[in-house]
Amino acid sequence: MNAQLIDGKAVAARVRAEVKAEVDRLKLEHGLTPGLAVVRVGEDPASKVYVNGKKKAAEEVGFRSWELHPDEGITQAALLEVIHQLNADPAVHGILVQLPLPRHIDPDVIISAVKPEKDVDGFHPLNAGNLLLGRSTTRACTPYGVMRLLEEIGCDPAGKRAVVVGRSNIVGKPMALMLLQKNATVTICHSKSDLRREVEGADILVVAVGAAELVKGAWIKPGAVVIDVGMNRKPDGKLVGDVEFAAAAERASFITPVPGGVGPMTIAMLMRNTLDAAVRYGLVPVVR
């Protein structure tokens, strides 16, 4: 393997340490403790694991945290009432609705009901629109984390060709916008794209589609930076990303492992977003 591994766990630990230091200062100087409320509907096993990870991180950095766990049969109207109560609670600075939601509940309606200033996922239409317009806003956690990883390895996107594989509202679209804001020339790939051709020209490649080893190592441009957001379980139980890791690592300059690459950064940047929401909500200037 020629590529250097990008250690997402180590970078995430640094982000959490930065957040904790700021939380300690807020408590000492202003009596302000950031509060994060997580809403998990039903018994989806993966959601339970993700929420537990978020609660653990929140405790580590010194937040107050609450998990609201309504039954899967809750009506959309009743869930909206839960959101409205959290919106009105001054102790809650960040609200996260864990996806997926049951089929009878429209996630767009629920996400849009969260106050934009308490939307720490960065999914509210107002925050998504502000990102599009280049305004200061809460950023979607996963692409925000990817940008921090690029910063950590000294990769300046300016003037580089960045290819984002996947166009979801959660990762692909905001990822492309964040790279564009840093003056990369950005291409978004989807099911109708000539994927190999686009990947072969990428200086920075971000793959987020949820398809095991879709991107072949032989396609990677020598010296490229490869960020693999995917996490897929193969029939033998092995976790792999969306990129053929071993072959890609022979050609890339930097590459994220799966697991241990992007995943830890998503939770770390959620902590960052929650702290920033608390600062804005409490009208206290951030010191960075």
From Swiss-Prot:
Keywords: Amino-acid biosynthesis, Histidine biosynthesis, Hydrolase, Methionine biosynthesis, Multifunctional enzyme, NADP, One-carbon metabolism, Oxidoreductase, Purine biosynthesis. GO terms for cellular component: cytosol. One of its GO terms (molecular function) is methylenetetrahydrofolate dehydrogenase (NADP+) activity. CDD domains: NAD_bind_m-THF_DH_Cyclohyd. The keyword Ribonucleoprotein does not apply. It catalyses: (6R)-5,10-methylene-5,6,7,8-tetrahydrofolate + NADP(+) = (6R)-5,10-methenyltetrahydrofolate + NADPH; (6R)-5,10-methenyltetrahydrofolate + H2O = (6R)-10-formyltetrahydrofolate + H(+). One of its GO terms (biological process) is tetrahydrofolate interconversion. Its EC number is 1.5.1.5, 3.5.4.9. InterPro entries: Aminoacid_DH-like_N_sf, NAD(P)-bd_dom_sf, THF_DH/CycHdrlase, THF_DH/CycHdrlase_cat_dom, THF_DH/CycHdrlase_CS, THF_DH/CycHdrlase_NAD-bd_dom. NADP(+) binds at residues 166-168, 191. Gene3D superfamilies: Leucine Dehydrogenase, chain A, domain 1, NAD(P)-binding Rossmann-like Domain. Pathway: One-carbon metabolism; tetrahydrofolate interconversion. Belongs to the tetrahydrofolate dehydrogenase/cyclohydrolase family. PANTHER family: C-1-TETRAHYDROFOLATE SYNTHASE, CYTOPLASMIC, C-1-TETRAHYDROFOLATE SYNTHASE, CYTOPLASMIC-RELATED. Homodimer. HAMAP family: THF_DHG_CYH. Catalyzes the oxidation of 5,10-methylenetetrahydrofolate to 5,10-methenyltetrahydrofolate and then the hydrolysis of 5,10-methenyltetrahydrofolate to 10-formyltetrahydrofolate. This is Bifunctional protein FolD 2. It comes from Myxococcus xanthus (strain DK1622). The gene is folD2.
